[in-house]
């Protein structure tokens, strides 16, 4: 527990509490917050916040952001999404089990078919993927399930 007195306690008995007598400590002399940016605080706003007031350009009300944003990953890079432990666990699995890879969870929304699929894997496939890619995975003994 702090034992030092607060300033208000120290100033008991001193009439003006350190705010002078003639100028006086008034409540909000310049207004609250950003008040007066166009008037009595104009110099500060023009100097340190240019462009704060006014409009620029046209407003698009129905803007669809990131409609074309779909990061892609190739088939030959799929195993980089799996940790080293999981890779070694499923490498020579006696029952031929394979890890399930969710590429959407890893941040990719498009799967491309470059490269070869060397071992079987279960894949949660995104909506952007190629048919020949599915054939490559099934040829090795894997499975593709549509996720999104």
Swiss-Prot record:
GO terms for cellular component: cytosolic large ribosomal subunit. GO terms for molecular function: structural constituent of ribosome. InterPro entries: Ribosomal_uL15/eL18, Ribosomal_uL15/eL18_sf. The keyword Ribonucleoprotein applies. Residues 1-30 have a biased composition (Basic residues). Keywords: Ribonucleoprotein, Ribosomal protein. Pfam families: Ribosomal_L27A (PF00828). Residues 1-37 are annotated as: Disordered. It comes from the Eukaryota. Belongs to the universal ribosomal protein uL15 family. PANTHER family: 60S RIBOSOMAL PROTEIN L27A (PTHR11721), LARGE RIBOSOMAL SUBUNIT PROTEIN UL15 (PTHR11721:SF3). This is Large ribosomal subunit protein uL15. The gene is RpL27A.
């Amino acid at each position: 527990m702090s034992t030092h007195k607060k300033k208000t306690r120290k100033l008991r008995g001193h009439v003006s509490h350190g705010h002078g007598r003639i100028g006086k400590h008034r409540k909000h002399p310049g207004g609250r917050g950003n008040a007066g940016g166009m008037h009595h605080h104009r110099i500060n706003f023009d100097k340190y916040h240019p462009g704060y007031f006014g409009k620029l350009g046209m407003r698009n009300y129905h803007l669809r952001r990131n409609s074309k944003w779909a990061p892609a990953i190739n088939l030959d890079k799929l195993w980089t999404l799996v940790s080293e432990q999981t890779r070694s666990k499923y490498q020579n699995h006696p029952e031929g089990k394979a890890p399930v890879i969710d590429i959407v969870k890893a941040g990719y929304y498009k799967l491309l078919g470059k490269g070869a699929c060397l071992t079987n894997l279960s894949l949660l496939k995104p909506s952007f993927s190629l048919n020949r890619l599915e054939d490559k995975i099934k040829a090795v003994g894997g499975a593709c399930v549509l996720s999104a």
